[in-house]
Amino acid sequence: CISTQVGCPIGCAFCATGNSGFQRNLEAYEMIGQVLGSERELQRRLKSNENGLITNVVYMGMGEPMLNYDQVIQSIYTLNDPKGINIGQRHITISTSGDVKGINRLARENLQVTLAISLHACNNELRNTLIPLNRKYPLEELIPSIQEYIRLTNRRVTFEYLLLDGINNSREDANMLI
């Protein structure tokens, strides 16, 4: 799980990162450095010199990956390079809070990465409260964008849904998910 920004401008209600404010976008080399640093730490803990211990990467740490799109894509190409870390594109996931513009760009990128959507609510009223970006890209825009991504890439999309007691975990919420 790697970060794409220092801080985050989205301000999701359930995420501590938004409380720290947004400072800057990370460069591609800083994202790659997180993967290399994690591999070094894993080697140390396993007392191993073996490379390739990191096999999957998820852009889901601090920040909204789609708001640093160009650097994220550059880092993916570097991570995927056989002369570099050589992580298969299908082992890379980009998680977004629903930036439709970024999803549409990614759909045309010809990458085999997995798209993950931080959904957390099935109606705009609650989603506006939990994920302020929903005010810019409501579900009526997000869902067609996801469908177009699937159509163009033939890739699956995963949905993330944090259960918040008394907020989005009712039977009605569950029924809206299906």
What is each of the regions a protein language model found here?
Residues 1-37:
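Canonical Radical SAM [4Fe-4S] cluster-binding loop centered on the CxxxCxxC motif
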Residues 40-178:
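Conserved AdoMet/S-adenosylmethionine-binding subsite of the radical SAM
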